[in-house]
Each structure stands twice: as C-alpha cells, then as structure tokens.
Amino acid sequence: MVKELSAFGGFGDSIVRGLRQPEYVHVLLNPLPVYGLLIAWIGLLIAFFSKSRRAQIATLVLVLISSLSAWPAYEFGQQGYDRVLSMTDEDGERWLDEHRDRAEDLIWIFYALAVLSAIAIAAPIKWPKSSAPLVIAVISLTAVTLGTGGYIAYAGGKIRHREFRNEPAPPKKTHEDEH
C-alpha cells in the first residue's frame, strides 16, 4: 500500500507520514463517534417508527460501529497527548487537559452503547418481543452519548483553535486534582 501511495508523489508520502502521527489519526477519527452516531440515531428513529426490523438492524450496526469508533479515537488521543501539549499555548494546555479528563471519565458510555446495541441486534432473535424496548433503550442511550461526545469534543475544539475560545480556559489542575 505504501508503494501505491508513493505513486501520488508528495501527497501520498504526506498521507503515510500523517498516519504515523497519533494526534493526526485522532483528528481523523474523532468525528466518527459524534457524526456517525448522529446519522445512525436519525436512521434508527426512522427505522423504529417505520417498524422495519431490517432497517433497525442496519442502523443498530451503524450505532455499534460508531460507538466502537470512540475506542481508537480515545487511544490515539492518549498517544498524541505529549506532542499536542508541546504545540499549545497555556490556555490550549488547560483545554487539552480538560479534553483528556472528560474523555477518560466518560469513554465508558460509548462502550456501554456498543454493548447495548449488540444486545439489541442479537436478543430479538431468541426473544422477538424484546426488539422494541431494546431499540428504545438504544435510541435513548444514543441521545445521551451524543451529548457526552459533544461535551468531550467541545473542550477538544478549543485546544488549537483560539477563535473558538469564547470563555476562559478551565483552571490549571494540580497533581492533587488528578484522580
């Protein structure tokens, strides 16, 4: 694949270099847990009200994939923390710490949604009457997870984008504040 990308000249080399930087991969992946979930949530609402089990399964799979995409976004964010820290100003550093803290504290909700959506796909095979309550539960938890993703992303957007900093940075954390 590297040889194929090199055929594009500097552009291909640039892509390969970027994919070796965890902070770059984080920026590529981090929209998936939010935008992917939003699209899947809208589709699941439509599938639920149209009472199409096939459409529900398809959109539940999208919820599952989108919620699971939070894991690599989180991991690459953790790996890229030090490099981004070295590029930020003092306010950006505080927003970076806030972004990391929010992600560390709340990543579990994405995993819970992935598990619930997998159950909502599989359980109705054996218990067909469980389908509607499980889809409603997934719709509800997806809405909460979308809010959570927005909350995490809000701090992340302020790290390197001064133009988005329309409020003071969070207070600097001491070692006592951590954990």
Across the structure, where does each feature detected by a protein language model lie?
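Polytopic transmembrane helical bundles with strong interfacial aromatic enrichment
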Residues: 2-179
